[in-house]
C-alpha cells in the first residue's frame, strides 16, 4: 500500500506498518438527512456520523468491528470472519470527509447507477 499525507506523513506510514492497518476496516456514507450533527465535535464517534451540507464519508484503516456482523456475533468464528472480509488489527483510525461527492455503482449488467449525490442517497 502506498500512502501520502500533507502533514504527519511519517505518523501515517508508521500506523499502516502495523499488521492489518494497511487495509480498510470500515467504510460509510452518511446521508445529511439522517444526522443532526452539523459541525465537527472533535470526537470521532460523533464526527464520523456528521451530516452537514454534503453528509460525509468516512473510511477506517485497520480493524473491522465484528459487532457489525448481521448474524449472531457470538457464533462468528475467526475463519468465517476472515472469509467475509473482516480485518483484524490493533489499529482502527477513522478518516472523515465532508466534501461534496457523487457515488456511482457499477452493476453486473455493465450499467451504472448513481446511489449518492449532494449528500443524500438517491435510490
Residue ranges and their predicted role:
Residues 1-123:
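Metal/cofactor-centered catalytic core regions of large enzymes
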Amino acid at each position: 500500500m502506498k500512502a501520502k499525507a500533507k502533514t504527519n506523513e511519517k505518523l501515517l506510514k508508521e500506523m499502516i506498518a502495523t499488521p492489518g492497518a494497511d487495509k480498510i476496516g470500515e467504510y460509510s456514507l452518511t446521508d445529511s438527512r439522517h444526522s443532526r450533527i452539523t459541525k465537527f465535535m472533535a470526537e470521532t464517534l460523533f464526527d464520523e456520523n456528521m451530516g452537514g451540507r454534503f453528509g460525509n464519508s468516512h473510511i477506517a484503516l485497520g480493524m473491522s468491528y465484528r459487532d457489525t456482523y448481521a448474524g449472531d456475533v457470538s457464533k462468528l468464528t475467526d475463519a468465517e470472519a476472515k472469509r467475509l472480509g473482516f480485518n483484524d488489527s490493533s489499529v482502527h483510525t477513522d478518516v472523515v470527509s465532508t466534501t461534496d461527492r457523487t457515488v456511482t455503482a457499477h452493476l453486473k449488467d455493465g450499467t451504472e447507477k448513481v446511489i449518492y449525490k449532494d449528500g443524500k442517497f438517491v435510490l
